[in-house]
Amino acid sequence: MNKELIKKILIKQGYRFTGNHSSVKICTWTKKSLVDKGVCYKEDFYGIQSHMCCQMTPCMHCPNECIYCWRTPDFFDSLTIKGKIDEPEDIINNCISNQRDLLNGFLGNPKLNKKKFKEAQNPKHFAISESGEPFLYPYLSELINELNKKGITSFLVTNGQFPKNIENLNKLPTQLYVSLDAPTKEIYKKIDKPKLKDYWERLNSSLELISNLKTRTVIRLTCIKGLNMCNEKDYANLIKKANPKFIEIKGYMWVGSSRERLDIKNMPLHAEIKEFAEQISKFTKYKIIDEKKESRVALLMKKDTEDRKLNFN
């Protein structure tokens, strides 16, 4: 498909390009929070204020073509950024300005919480997870540093395919996620459709690396019914390598482009997520600490701590 046509489709879907390879998109939970119809599980679990969250990516390129991804995978088929590389401060400023423009559509909504809308003009949190693989952006440390200077927290999500980049990161995010989509190499290949030949070794190296990072770390399992909700002992062994502060066990949602590759039957119920989380708990030292039925997600920790929820006061 022509890339300009794909770009138009993405813009129609709510994406805004903030540079040559970076973009922003308002999260569904940000929209809901602005009209007081619920908040993201990250607000319940970690204290992130949904209406003040900016969902973005510094790089839309990705080494995987995950079958559960709701994003359109066709736009960037290269593992390198071609052309001009967006500057960190430009990305941040453009994300905020584009998000403000997108939020203006709420001004005519009679249910709009005006206090939240005013606060939303200046995000306090960046979810670096909207699309692509952030570690393909060469100035990721500088981006995180700029966010820190502005008093903005960051949750960074990686697929773990670039362990050397993780190792070389000299500015750590507030919270670092590694996606663990499968318990075995064979299942991973089926679900994530990696482009790199040594994908399993790369993932395992990343898991080992984050065990020593001095920041909040998370292993996230995206559970697809009938495909990867199995081999709990294998999952447990991988989790032990990473020794994360948190484990998120979240159900796959049948939305976006993933509907072309999966069936609604692949979307597990919250009860099934909780049951699977209990099985993971049996083989690890982690316990279910919290859950959110609407998001079909369970949070596991070795023990709950007072600093679980971030303080934004």
Question: Where in the sequence are the language-model features?
Answer:
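Flexible, acidic/Gly-rich N-terminal and inter-domain linker regions that tether
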Residues: 1-60, 64-68, 72-101
